[in-house]
Curated annotation (Swiss-Prot):
Keywords: Metal-binding, Ribonucleoprotein, Ribosomal protein, RNA-binding, rRNA-binding, Zinc. Coiled coil: none annotated. The lineage of its organism: Bacteria, Bacillati, Bacillota, Bacillota incertae sedis, Caldicellulosiruptorales. Belongs to the bacterial ribosomal protein bL31 family. Type A subfamily. Part of the 50S ribosomal subunit. Its cofactor is Zn(2+). GO terms for molecular function: metal ion binding; rRNA binding; structural constituent of ribosome. PROSITE patterns: RIBOSOMAL_L31 (PS01143). This is Large ribosomal subunit protein bL31. Gene3D superfamilies: Ribosomal protein L31. GO terms for cellular component: ribonucleoprotein complex; ribosome. PANTHER family: 50S RIBOSOMAL PROTEIN L31, CHLOROPLASTIC (PTHR33280), LARGE RIBOSOMAL SUBUNIT PROTEIN BL31C (PTHR33280:SF1). Pfam families: Ribosomal_L31. GO terms for biological process: translation.
Length: 69
C-alpha cells in the first residue's frame, strides 16, 4: 500500500445521538453525531412516532395546489 494516502482509522470513535445515547465504534472520524439510533428509532423501540416528517404534507399540498379550505 502507498504511504501517506490513507485516512487515519480510529478504533475508539465516539458516536453521539440526539437522544443522548453514545457508543464506541471504528471510523475515520474521531466523533460522529447522528439524529437517530437504535435506542430511539421506532423500529427498535416498538413505539410509533413521526421521524423527520415535519412539513412534508404541507409542502406536497402547496406544490400541487391542493390546499384544504
Amino acid at each position: 500500500m502507498k504511504e501517506g494516502i490513507h485516512l487515519t482509522y480510529y478504533h475508539d470513535a465516539v458516536v453521539r445521538c440526539a437522544c443522548g445515547e453514545t457508543f464506541i465504534t471504528g471510523s475515520t472520524k474521531k466523533e460522529i453525531h447522528v439524529e437517530i439510533c437504535s435506542k430511539c428509532h421506532p423500529f427498535f423501540t416498538g413505539k410509533q412516532k413521526f421521524v423527520d416528517t415535519t412539513g412534508r404534507v404541507e409542502r406536497f399540498m402547496k406544490k400541487y395546489g391542493l390546499d384544504q379550505k
